[in-house]
Amino acid sequence: MKVLLQLISFLFLGIFGFSQENTKPIPACEFLTKYQNVRDFTISTTQDEIYFSIQNPAEDRAVIAVIKKQKNKWQEPQMTSFSGNYRNIEPFLTQDGLRLYFASNRPIDETTTKAKDYDIWYVERKDLKSKWSKPINVGAPVNSTNNEFYPCITTNGNLYFTADAIKTLGKDDILVCKWDGKQYTEPENLGMNINSTGYEFNAFVSPNEEFIIYTCYGRPDGLGSGDLYISYKNNKGNWDEPKNLGEKINSKQMDYCPFYDTTTQTLYFTSKRMIVIEKTFTNLKEFETEISSYENGFSRIYKYQIKL
């Protein structure tokens, strides 16, 4: 009996000890480790199609890439048909997989090649095996003569995005244009519970609008740069005060571009986290290993298992 009790005690402590361990975010996917500077992540509900952004080190050029799973095996990443020129970032795949929204500084008029401010665009397809259409500008009232970024579409068609001028409380804010069944309504600021006179940007809103995850920059309870925060919608339909997701997820560097996979309860996000170890290097190989590590200050995509 004593041995049995000791065994039960060991298992109990082991189970609960494991759940209390300081688990941390890990690289999102093996194939992403070969890219020096990546950001943004969206995955299909069927778990067989991933879109992400690849940038150059200066972050002034970017393409949206796709990787597909065939016969239970991930294929090589490919550049999407609508990328290759201008700066295309922040893909978001709708629940049915038939539309992909993104932000781009491409010109609206095909007669010019001059880049413009950032707008929300989308491509569409008839079914999951069809090719994407040419990019379509969402238009007003979503887009304006200023910048619009990071689209997120909920099940009812509401479009959440980041704006840096129109209807903001100061700097970047999260706005929503609601879908009334025929068209989008005028942009609405999510209010002081979500936004401030500072920077709030890049929001993921759950399909049923139960919670929102987004980046707040330089807040008093932050860890040093931009942190991921979460807010839940209360029974009155209002957003509660956001809470910092904490040190298990956030870092001292920029943490942004969240995407939550409700199927697997996995949070994907981009981070410029960097682990600096004060050490003396004895040869060049050691230094090369240090600066080429995953957590080296460049944008990288991470994942973290969490039930929200």
Per-range role (PLM):
Residues 1-23:
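Bacterial Sec-dependent N-terminal signal peptides
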Residues 20-308:
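Short, conserved micro-motifs composed of acidic
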